[in-house]
């Protein structure tokens, strides 16, 4: 029984070209023979979806199929004007290559004379919170591959030239039959370069590039956070045989700070004050990341955990004219190692204290006493 092309792709009869292509791409990736070696069922499914897509992607063939079904492509069907159009191995390989070429940067992949883009590089950098606040220009040294100046990147000994690979005619790819269709693979004669180097450059050993440490200047903007990535285009490894260089990615991390904790653009810190300052009121100074000293007033009767907000004293937001706030939490320090006189004064203070001085604690113990007395009754 012949397959229904729409069912093979898992689409409706009203599916547009975009839906057809997406369905084919998904199924082709699933059933591709390279992913399912020695699996006849996967090969059969792969052939079915290829046949279905090749028919439905063509408006004329699709119209004929919608009207006459498979009879449109049988001998004599439609006056012999249509075939199944599968075109053997080469036709399907072209379809597959066209679609999946888009996933690899658009269009069909060709070695373009063996040129290869250089690899991207990663560099990890740690900065202080102060540097993240103000921004900085950092000098880094990066070991990387650069174009060989002896052979200008050709890989061939000066005075000689690479020759075109006869196996792939310079494309770097060869077509190989695999069952009912053919696929392109890297040329084994030149390893995908498209060229053969008979006399390699002695400095780079035919690679077209050498390893060297480079010094680069990196601008770190104010407001960066953990994981911020900076891209330096063209500062990665040199390309091969005239190919473009890769990029360098700087991954930034911010060191933990001794006093401040960060949450987005806001900063948090704890400031210890004495019990008497909390009770009588007072003030203290706090150093902020902009280098200034900010005076904070403590009102009488300040409780432990009280939070003060200093607007605009937090972190700048990356590439925006916005700054977060600084939140200061009060940490009341209980006195230790009391002298005899200090103890006497505190004991006297305790005797003079009333419920009005400590309403929360007085109310709590009163409620607790009433609770347990009620249980005993």
Swiss-Prot record:
Pfam families referenced in this protein's UniProt entry, alphabetically: DnaJ, DnaJ_C, DnaJ_CXXCXGXG
Q: Where does Zn(2+) 2 bind?
A: 165, 168, 187, 190
Cellular compartment(s): Cytoplasm
Top-level taxon: Bacteria
Task: Tell me the InterPro entries matching this sequence.
Answer: DnaJ, DnaJ_C, DnaJ_domain, DnaJ_domain_CS, HSP40/DnaJ_pept-bd, HSP_DnaJ_Cys-rich_dom, HSP_DnaJ_Cys-rich_dom_sf, J_dom_sf
The name under which this protein is listed is Chaperone protein DnaJ
Indicate the segments forming the J domain, all copies: 4-69
Q: Which organism is it from?
A: Brucella canis (strain ATCC 23365 / NCTC 10854 / RM-666)
The cofactors required by this protein are: Zn(2+)
Which ranges does the UniProt record give for the CXXCXGXG motif repeats? 148-155, 165-172, 187-194, 201-208
- Report the HAMAP family cross-referenced here: DnaJ
Task: State the taxonomy lineage.
Answer: Bacteria, Pseudomonadati, Pseudomonadota, Alphaproteobacteria, Hyphomicrobiales
Entry annotated with the keyword Cytoplasm: yes
Query: What the protein does?
Result: Participates actively in the response to hyperosmotic and heat shock by preventing the aggregation of stress-denatured proteins and by disaggregating proteins, also in an autonomous, DnaK-independent fashion. Unfolded proteins bind initially to DnaJ; upon interaction with the DnaJ-bound protein, DnaK hydrolyzes its bound ATP, resulting in the formation of a stable complex. GrpE releases ADP from DnaK; ATP binding to DnaK triggers the release of the substrate protein, thus completing the reaction cycle.
Subunit (UniProt) = Homodimer.
Which UniProt keywords are given for this protein, alphabetically ordered?
Answer: Chaperone, Cytoplasm, DNA replication, Metal-binding, Repeat, Stress response, Zinc, Zinc-finger
């Amino acid at each position: 029984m012949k397959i229904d092309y729409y069912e093979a792709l898992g689409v409706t009869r009203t599916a547009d070209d975009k839906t057809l292509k997406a369905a084919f791409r998904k199924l082709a990736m699933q059933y591709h023979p390279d992913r399912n070696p020695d699996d006849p069922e996967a090969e059969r499914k792969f052939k079915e979806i290829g046949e279905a897509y090749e028919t439905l992607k063509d408006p004329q063939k699709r119209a004929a199929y919608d009207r006459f079904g498979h009879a449109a492509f049988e001998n004599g069907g439609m006056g012999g004007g249509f075939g199944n159009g599968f075109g053997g191995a080469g036709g399907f390989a072209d379809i597959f290559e066209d679609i999946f070429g888009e996933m690899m940067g658009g269009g069909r992949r060709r070695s373009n004379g063996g040129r290869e883009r250089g690899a991207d590089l990663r560099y990890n950098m740690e900065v202080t919170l102060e540097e993240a606040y103000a921004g900085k220009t950092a000098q880094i040294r990066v070991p990387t591959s650069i174009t060989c100046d002896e052979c200008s990147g050709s890989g061939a000994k000066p005075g000689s030239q690479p020759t075109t690979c006869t196996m792939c005619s310079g494309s770097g790819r060869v077509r190989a039959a695999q069952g009912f269709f053919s696929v392109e693979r890297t040329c084994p004669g030149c390893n995908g370069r498209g060229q053969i180097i008979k006399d390699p450059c002695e400095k780079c050993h035919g690679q077209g590039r050498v390893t060297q440490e480079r010094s680069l200047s990196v601008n770190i903007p104010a407001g960066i956070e953990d994981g911020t990535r900076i891209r330096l285009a063209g500062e990665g490894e040199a390309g091969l045989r005239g190919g473009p260089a890769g990029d360098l990615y700087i991954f930034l991390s911010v060191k933990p700070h001794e006093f401040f904790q960060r949450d987005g653009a806001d900063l948090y810190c704890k400031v210890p004050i004495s019990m008497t300052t909390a009770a009588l009121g007072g003030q203290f100074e706090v150093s902020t990341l902009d280098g200034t000293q900010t005076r904070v007033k403590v009102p009488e009767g300040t409780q432990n955990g009280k939070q003060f907000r200093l607007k605009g004293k937090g972190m700048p937001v990356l590439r925006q004219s916005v700054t977060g706030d600084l939140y200061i939490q009060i940490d009341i320090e209980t006195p230790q190692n009391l002298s005899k006189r200090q103890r006497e004064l505190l004991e006297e203070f305790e005797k003079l204290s009333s419920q009005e001085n400590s309403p929360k604690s007085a109310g709590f113990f009163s409620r607790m006493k009433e609770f347990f007395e009620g249980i005993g009754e």
